[in-house]
Amino acid sequence: MNDNPIRCFVAFDFSPEAKAFIHSIIEKNQTRLPQARWVQPNQIHVTLQFFAALLPTQVNQVKLIIQNFFPLIESFPSTLAEIGAFSSWNRARVIWLGFDHRSGEIMKQATQVFNEECTKQGIAVDRTRPFSPHLTLARLKNPVSILPQQLFQPTCYTTSIRQVSFYQSTLTPRGPIYSPLITIPLKEVK
């Protein structure tokens, strides 16, 4: 790593089986919303915190926070529930997949504590928007008005969240490339 700031983010990862299920939802919706830029299977994750520009020393600090904090969190079941849109169905820019209440609360709590640890270490975190647990399925360049019933709504699917990763995000003309800087397993539930 050189001294240039890097784009990076912390995210919960999914198992290959869960990614395959999520990708099947994307495939069923691509023809229903062809103007959207759909997420590739290898980029499926839940972003807990995005950092637009961290210096290498800050990257190392974040790695240490992740190594010290996330192994204390127990792996947890998470049910993928419904499809939604940001900012609204009338002005959709992001199509997302939401979670059951319990796992959403675990994600919110983990993000809050992680952000507090970063702040204590002098690392600025984005607090302009409250954390809303979701998995991005697609992005739209221009907002569109769509009805929820226009999209394939999946049946509920339960998986386990077992690890967190810290990714570098490199922007390219073909889309972002995510490179894991560190991956840490959550505490295994016995």
Q: Residues of each region from the PLM?
A:
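Histidine-dependent nucleotide/RNA phosphoesterase domain, centered on the 2H-phosphoesterase fold
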Residues: 1-190
